[in-house]
Amino acid sequence: MKSWISISFLCMLFPLSNGQLGSSGQVTLQGAQISQATQSLQGTAPTSQYPQGGTQISQGGAQATQNYQGVAQGTQISQGLTQGAQISQGGGQGISQGATQGTQFSQGTVPSGQFFQNIVQGTQAVLSGAQHSQAGAQGSQFPQSAAHTAQHHQGTAQPAQSGTHAILKEMEKSLAEFKAYVEYLENMVYKERMKYPSPYIQNFTASPSNFTYTTFENDVDMRLSSMERISSELVKQMVNCPRGPVPPPPPQSVMVQSDTVDNSSNIYVSWDPPYFEGKPLTGENMHYKVYFSPSDQYGKATGGEFIFRICDANFTQASVTDLNPRSFYSIQVAATLCEAIESEGTSTSVKTPDLIPSAPLNLKLEGTKPNAFAVSWDPPTVKGTLTNYTIYATEESGKATMVTIDPKLTSYALYNLYEGTMYTIRIAASSDNGMSPKSEPLEVTTDKFIPMAPRNVRAIDNNLTSVTLEWDAPLPGRGMIRGYRINYTLDFTDYEEMLISDPSITTATITNLTPATEYYFQVFARTMKRLGYGSHLIMNKTKMDVPSEPMSVVHRIMDNGLQRIQVSWQPPENTYGPIIDYIIHWGVRGGATRKEFLTPYVLSWTSDFLDDNANHDFKLFAQNVVGIGKPVAFSVKTLPKPQILVPNVRVKRETSKNNITSLTVTWGSPKVPVDGFFVLYRKYEGVYSDRWKFIEIPKPNARGTTITVTQENVPYVVVCKGFKRQKKPTSNLSSQQFSFPGQQVGQQQSNPWI
């Protein structure tokens, strides 16, 4: 172990308990200088050779002068303690003598006055000795002046513990004897009371003989009471007497740290003062001792112990320098009062950090591939115990790759790199104390690589909006394939792309395509930086779908006495092939629904006659070979109309010689004036199986008409209605026009019924 030791305000140094060295400032001692400094202090070595030691001699002499007074005071306290012990012994002897005489007195050989006088005098002597012993004990427990015994005498510091320990031992012996005397006295008083009962004692029976010695018994009782009082005082004094020296509490919050700088390790220890009754213990009598020794990892000492004493209680830190790196040491801090009384302390084991390595040497390139290279190096000259190497590979873009490897290795290959890319390589070594500087940089460029084309590209599935492709991987090359890219287009003027990041995946589904549309596909293998050669083109057509809804739907109500609706529209945005039909579903809300098919080339439709003052629902569909698409839905409410009832309507079917079938319709006179009549008729083969046809008769007095029909055996439905024209023909038409969000409103057409 190296022996550089630095302690702030070092007062005493005990290498293996072979002496003391005192100073008042920073002390640095190494190896043989310890013995040389000791010789200088003893006067055997010239002080001129050791100027620092000479300064310490002068300081030690000055402090020794101040300490002589403390020695004298300590001697006086010691004498007081000894005197107290002697008095206590005398009191004990007096008690013992009184007890002997008391025994003789009880036998009638000693006068009673002398017996009680010996007892009282012995008790008072013990009490006085106890008071002296207490003063001596307190002086030895916390000696304010006697603490500074001669630390520096004629240039050398001598131990000042033997005198104090002797005093404490003597005091402890005296206190033990004192306790025995008090117990003996109390026992003797109790026995004497039992011999001479008094009226104050329970179960006492008076007798003539007792009354004969009344004066004597009162005298005995009074003296026994006096001895009891003195004994109780002795007990009180004995409680306050300490049984021995009381150590101070240990230092608080002891912290030990270590570092290694420039191939040398240091240990730093700090602490807080001990506390007594909530206050820190300080003062000139409070010192600290730091115990330091090399140890193993379990805290067991493996070398000699060094003890350092810090005289100034205001300094609560110390350092031990120039130690071996990566080594274990034990540190313990204790507080001392008056040099002889020392607190308990807990030993702390600390391991000094290892050396910080120097940079690795001779970094060089061993070989390259498109996605890898290998490097080698020499270990650092200063390395201690290495924990790992760290290799840094930085691209031109600044992106860095870091790899940590085993410290036993001196070469390594980095993989998964970009092809055709320059990297800057550095390496650093680490111990458990930190990382070395990085080595000199080495520039390395990986080989270039272009992948071959994927093989056997094919479409394995499709639907309305997607196509699924599959292919075989390219033939192996020197580099790594990172994934694939699929380009697809409609007309080669522009293309979309799909990326696959996993090179093991050789199938993909391209989505969000248009139904019934031809697409062209090409697959590429790719690296991190470039595409490889493209595969052959393949074409695939998505499946057809039903058309989307018709666009720009416009509708309006037409009214010439009978209300209708007219609807117009534009073809769907996506027809997915030719439109076969347009289909309209319509009817009174809550009633039967009619279905009409329209030719794909006519983009308008006029409804049959509508019910007055009723809601009608409409749905318009487009249809192709796949099926019927989504509808456009809308609703219309017709206007209210006055109802003119025509009574007695009769229908008669007649067939002429030429096989012409006609319906003769007659009716009665309405109750209100009319301008004419409407006669409506249609075939009745089911609900809404045919459209209404009508005849307008603009004669208010007409009472019948004839309708020619083409189908002889088909039933017909006939309705007769009266109507009254409006006074202003220009307002005869009432129309409503509607459109839908995103659709254009068509222009209003003229009313064909006016």
Swiss-Prot record:
Protein keywords: Repeat, Secreted, Signal
Biased composition (Low complexity): 130-161
CC per GO annotation: extracellular region
Signal peptide limits: 1-19
InterPro entries for this protein: ECM_Regulatory_Proteins, FN3_dom, FN3_sf, Ig-like_fold
Residue segments, region Disordered: 40-61, 85-106, 130-163, 731-754
Superkingdom: Eukaryota
Domain Fibronectin type-III: from-to ranges: 250-355, 359-449, 453-545, 549-642, 645-742
Tissues showing expression: Prismatic layer of shell (at protein level). Expressed primarily in the mantle with highest level in the outer epithelium of the mantle edge and lower level in the mantle pallium.
Name recorded for this polypeptide: Fibronectin type III domain-containing protein 1
Species of provenance: Margaritifera margaritifera
